[in-house]
Structure formats: structure tokens, C-alpha cells
């Protein structure tokens, strides 16, 4: 944090990269330090949520955490029961987080073939007060195409309306992900969801 010149003037600070809560105490210390150095900053933490506890959430809140984003991933290869278990787990985690961090949301890739499960997830997250959801275009990260092919995915062609640097960390977009994301936004609007 201190190596970034002018960090005390930051408006937003995010802690991500792997799973920050593998080292929960260090994550709490980082949030506390960042909040002390830049009290005006909106401090966000990204997590899969596997290590969330009331104690950790209380310490993060007290340290100055403004927002928590849960990572959720549905899989087109999942059975309906497996999708249901993923949704239940995400909703349980969101309900727990909301008790401590009001600005709690989900950030997840939109995977073609998961429309029904995604719609259910949106409704259930909204019901427990999720602050929002960040729908990410699903990307191929340039390794192990076999798993993508096995699930029936295809790279979008052309990948982007405007050509830019192909070494973008997200990889190539998967066909139909963007269209499904737009359908999900329309679904949320039709249902009057608050997230």
C-alpha cells in the first residue's frame, strides 16, 4: 500500500487475488491499515466466501470494509441438484455477509446454458437483500480448451467489435455469454429486482 504514491488520496481500494481470507488476519490488517491511511476510500474485498465466519465479518466491518463481493460460479455440466446446492450456498453466504457488510454483492461469470439457474439465483439473492450483482462475460483464459469444448462452448467470433490487445488477462469471450447477460438484466428489470 505504501509503495503506491498518493495512495492516501485513493477513492477506492480492492483486496483480491486468489482468496484473501486464506490469511484472514492479514486481510483484516490490510483493510484496517488502508482505512487508516485513506479514510475516505471505499474498501472492497473479493472472496469465494468459503472462509467467512461471523468473527471474520465483524472484524472486517470494524476495520473499515465498505463492500464485500462474493464469487459464484454455476456450471453448465451441473445437475439441477448441484446447481441448487451452489445457489443455496451463495444465498446462505450472502445472508450472513449482509448482517455485517451492507454493501454485499455477487460477481460471477455468465456461463451459457445456466439461464434457469441464474434467474433463480438472481431472485434469491434479491430476496436476502444483495446490494447488486456484477455479471461478467465468460472468457476462455488460453489454457485447457478441452474442458470448454466438453461443455459445448465456442469462442465468440469475432471476439470484440473493436480489436484491441489480445493479451488481455480475461482471455477470449465465450459465445452467447454476453447475450445471456443482457437477457438476465432484462429478466431482473421485468421482475422488479432491487439488485
Residue ranges and their predicted role:
Residues 8-23, 37-52, 63-90, 103-112, ...:
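Core AdoMet radical
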Residues 28-39, 61, 94-99, 185-190:
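Surface-exposed amphipathic alpha-helices with a cationic face
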Residues 89-195:
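Conserved C-terminal portion of the radical SAM core fold
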Residues 24-30, 53-61, 90-92, 118-121, ...:
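Distinct, well-ordered alpha-helical segments
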Residues 5-6, 61, 126:
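Non-catalytic positions within long, well-ordered alpha-helices that form the structural scaffold/packing
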Residues 21-34, 84, 88-95, 154-157:
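Short, composition-biased local secondary-structure segments
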Residues 5-9, 188-190:
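Flexible, charged surface loops at secondary-structure boundaries
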Residues 1:
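Canonical Radical SAM [4Fe-4S] cluster-binding loop centered on the CxxxCxxC motif
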